[in-house]
Structure formats: C-alpha cells, structure tokens
Amino acid sequence: MAKGSKGFIVSIMGPVVDVKFPEEELPDIYNALEVVNPQTGQKVVLEVEQLIGDGVVRTVAMDSTDGLTKGLEVVDTGAPITAPVGKEVLGRILNVIGEPVDEAGEIKAKERWPIHRPAPELVEQSTEIEILETGIKVIDLLAPFPKGGKIGFFGGAGVGKTVLVMELIRNIAIEHKGFSVFAGVGERTREGNELWLEMQESGVLGNTVLVFGQMNEPPGARFRVALTALTIAEYFRDVEGRDVLLFIDNIFRFVQAGSEVSALLGRMPSAVGYQPTLATDMGELQERITSTRRGSITSVQAIYVPADDITDPAPATTFAHLDATVVLSRRIAELGLYPAVDPLDSSSKILDPAIVGREHYEVARGVQEVLQRYKDLQDIIAILGVEELSPEDKLVVHRARRIQRFLSQPFHVAERFTGRPGRYVPIEETIRGFKEILDGKLDDVPEQAFLMAGNIDEVKERAKEMRS
C-alpha cells in the first residue's frame, strides 16, 4: 500500500472513526492514519481495524476525537504505529504512539519498531529455567519467579498491587542493575505521576522506561499501550541481549479497553459483555513475552479482579498464560500484614525440588502445611478458644502466627509513609529464617518481633531488646 494516500472522515462514533479512501488506495489493517484536529492543531492517529466495503475503513483513535468533523482529510502513513527503541528512551515517559509526555525534549532514537510484531520462533526460545530473586520473602519462598516467565498479581482495589510492583522495579534496578519497562494501562494518572517522582527520588529512573495510556485516555490508547511497552522491551532483549522486566499495571484494563472498542466495531459481545476476541487479544500480547537465547523478558502483571470474582472471564483468561501467581488478600491486608500476599493461594510452576533445590522446596511446603492447618483450626478457635486445642495444635497455632508475621516485610518505596527503612532479603536468608521457625528454634521469641522484619537476625535483635 502506497504511503500518503488520502481519504476523508465519513462517520465518528466516539473513539471509532470511519474513513473513506479511493478503492484502489485502501490502507492495510493496523496501518496508522493521521488527521489534524482543527480545534487543537494536533495530529490524531487512527489505527485501521476493519475494511467494511465501498472504500470505507473503520479505525480506532489513539487520542480524543473531540473537534474532529466529517469531511476532514486523513492521510495513510503506510505503516503501523511505531515506537522509538534503544537506550535513548531510558528515563523517559512515552504515550502509545511513542511521543514523550514528560516535557524533557524530543527523543532522538535511532530506530523505531512497529508495535505489531510476531512472537519469537520456537527455535529461538530458551529452554533453561532460572529463578529471578526479588528480595521479597513471601514471593521468593512460596511463589518464586522464573526468569523470562509471566507472573500475575491478583487482587481487588486497594490491597497493594501497585506498591508491590514499585518495590520490584526498585529491587531489579538497584540489586540486579536490570532494565525495566513499565506499561501504565488504564490506571490513575496520579499513580503514574507518583511512580515517576518515586523513581526519580530512588535513582532508578535511568534504568526504566515508562509508557502510559491512563484512565482518562480513549480506549484505543489503553488497548495498544501494552504493545508499545512490549516493543521497547523486545528491543532490549533481542538487540542488546538484556534481561528485561516488563510491568503491566493493569492487564484487566487492557481487556476492558478491548471490550469498549469491540462493541463500537460492531462485534457481538461474548460472556459478561467482553469482546469475542478476548482469548486472541490476550494471546497475541502474552506470546511475545518470553526468553530467547539472547535475553529475556520477565513480565509482572497486576490483575484487578472485578468484585473479587476470580472466575470473571478477564482474570480467568489471563490465568492460562501465567507461570506464577501472587494473590493479594484483603483479609491479610486488614490484619495489617504487608505485602498482603496470600501464602496458600499464591503459587509458582517452578516450586519444584529439581529447580529450586530440595531444602527450598521442603521449607516452602512446611510453611504452607503449618498455615493450612492453622486455617483449618480457625473455626474451632472461634467457637471454643485456643485453650481447648490439643498440645500439637497449640504448637501449630503458635508457629503459624510467627510465620504469618515473618512473611511481612518493610518496603523501600513505602519508607516515607511508614517511617521504616526497607529491607531486601536474599533467598538463602529467607529459607534459613523460615527453617528456624519450623524447627522450633524461635518458639520463645515474642510474636511482635517477627512483624515487619527483614531477615531472622533482625528478629533475634528485636527479641533481645524486648527482653532487656
């Protein structure tokens, strides 16, 4: 298709714009079209989604269509939406079409890549399994992250998904010197601004790219922004051979944006009003996130669970792609235990003695066993009280409460809110700490000493102070 062919707008339905072209000059699907908004003088990018006959193409706008009118001239760029790639984008904030939104000047990238790209061939993909250490005890012990894997953070509103994501970005940048790409998909602009300021303060911004398509933006931008971020991450993996962390906050908003445009594009809705192409849309994004022989992209995806219903089609479709799941629980958050990760619902496919080692596996299973038994005893405790339990069960409760508290941890990114300095705990320290609790070596240490501690030595220090 020749670049520069011209058409004109024939219909505008919110974010969906129909454009008529000469029959012999129709743009391809996914081509980016440009139209100048007469009210603002700014160009609006339209992405071709359907060819509907008689020279008319149906497009989705990447910016507000306020001010556009029928009859306006539209130009075909002859190519899909592209994103700037390379080290020039580090430390910058971009929008869905790769424009800077941080008022820090133009991005002088040497290359731009199209955001629609095929997933790596099977022969290019890596088959080795490695653990990515996060420094967060509950994750490293019970739901270890595979390098190049996909990890889901499930939770309702306000249980701490975004804070956990911010801590991971900080740990990867400072402890691992890795690059991170953050895709803000349909989340609050305030949170994006806070994240940017937080990263400037902690000095990790130089290793990070932020790509935002926030709540106030049209569904087209929210639907495509994850692909823009992924394209930038793919460059670091494929050309520079880096291990990259891709954060998507929130993958549910990606699905939600897709369902918003789907009905306007004239597609019949499927279950719960979602788009009929839900599984395909999700697959096209997720299959590009993988390890190759050159480098890896490990993806952490915050997943909002509508009305805390995990069977909703959006979270349920995401589940199929994940290697590890971190479930955040309102019940644990209400106890004041942060991160509010549910140790029984969270899991990882690599928690296997052949991968993590026998000791790690046995300590993790031992911790879950004690916590599960404690959960089973809750009804008896509520009715009869702890005193009516057998000595063995009393010991289970005693240790479970210490484990529960030791799973909490102060975060670096929350320091200015909590006043507690953050802690990064290596995996070996985490395993050693929980092993000592399971072996009964700390049965005489007060519960309170375990709360919001780093490693087990810090707990012992606190216990000494409490006794003195």
UniProtKB/Swiss-Prot annotation:
<keyword id="KW-0813">Transport</keyword>
<dbReference type="InterPro" id="IPR027417">
    <property type="entry name" value="P-loop_NTPase"/>
</dbReference>
<dbReference type="Pfam" id="PF00006">
    <property type="entry name" value="ATP-synt_ab"/>
</dbReference>
<feature type="binding site">
    <location>
        <begin position="155"/>
        <end position="162"/>
    </location>
    <ligand>
        <name>ATP</name>
    </ligand>
</feature>
<protein>
    <recommendedName>
        <fullName>ATP synthase subunit beta</fullName>
        <ecNumber>7.1.2.2</ecNumber>
    </recommendedName>
</protein>
<dbReference type="InterPro" id="IPR055190">
    <property type="entry name" value="ATP-synt_VA_C"/>
</dbReference>
<dbReference type="InterPro" id="IPR005722">
    <property type="entry name" value="ATP_synth_F1_bsu"/>
</dbReference>
<dbReference type="GO" id="GO:0016887">
    <property type="term" value="F:ATP hydrolysis activity"/>
</dbReference>
<keyword id="KW-0997">Cell inner membrane</keyword>
<keyword id="KW-0472">Membrane</keyword>
<dbReference type="InterPro" id="IPR000194">
    <property type="entry name" value="ATPase_F1/V1/A1_a/bsu_nucl-bd"/>
</dbReference>
<keyword id="KW-0375">Hydrogen ion transport</keyword>
<keyword id="KW-1003">Cell membrane</keyword>
<keyword id="KW-0066">ATP synthesis</keyword>
<comment type="subunit">
    <text>F-type ATPases have 2 components, CF(1) - the catalytic core - and CF(0) - the membrane proton channel. CF(1) has five subunits: alpha(3), beta(3), gamma(1), delta(1), epsilon(1). CF(0) has three main subunits: a(1), b(2) and c(9-12). The alpha and beta chains form an alternating ring which encloses part of the gamma chain. CF(1) is attached to CF(0) by a central stalk formed by the gamma and epsilon chains, while a peripheral stalk is formed by the delta and b chains.</text>
</comment>
<comment type="similarity">
    <text>Belongs to the ATPase alpha/beta chains family.</text>
</comment>
<comment type="function">
    <text>Produces ATP from ADP in the presence of a proton gradient across the membrane. The catalytic sites are hosted primarily by the beta subunits.</text>
</comment>
<keyword id="KW-0139">CF(1)</keyword>
<dbReference type="GO" id="GO:0005524">
    <property type="term" value="F:ATP binding"/>
</dbReference>
<dbReference type="InterPro" id="IPR003593">
    <property type="entry name" value="AAA+_ATPase"/>
</dbReference>
<keyword id="KW-0547">Nucleotide-binding</keyword>
<keyword id="KW-0067">ATP-binding</keyword>
<dbReference type="GO" id="GO:0046933">
    <property type="term" value="F:proton-transporting ATP synthase activity, rotational mechanism"/>
</dbReference>
<dbReference type="GO" id="GO:0045259">
    <property type="term" value="C:proton-transporting ATP synthase complex"/>
</dbReference>
<dbReference type="GO" id="GO:0005886">
    <property type="term" value="C:plasma membrane"/>
</dbReference>
<dbReference type="InterPro" id="IPR036121">
    <property type="entry name" value="ATPase_F1/V1/A1_a/bsu_N_sf"/>
</dbReference>
<keyword id="KW-1278">Translocase</keyword>
<dbReference type="InterPro" id="IPR004100">
    <property type="entry name" value="ATPase_F1/V1/A1_a/bsu_N"/>
</dbReference>
<dbReference type="Pfam" id="PF02874">
    <property type="entry name" value="ATP-synt_ab_N"/>
</dbReference>
<dbReference type="InterPro" id="IPR024034">
    <property type="entry name" value="ATPase_F1/V1_b/a_C"/>
</dbReference>
<dbReference type="Pfam" id="PF22919">
    <property type="entry name" value="ATP-synt_VA_C"/>
</dbReference>
<keyword id="KW-0406">Ion transport</keyword>
<dbReference type="InterPro" id="IPR050053">
    <property type="entry name" value="ATPase_alpha/beta_chains"/>
</dbReference>
<dbReference type="InterPro" id="IPR020003">
    <property type="entry name" value="ATPase_a/bsu_AS"/>
</dbReference>
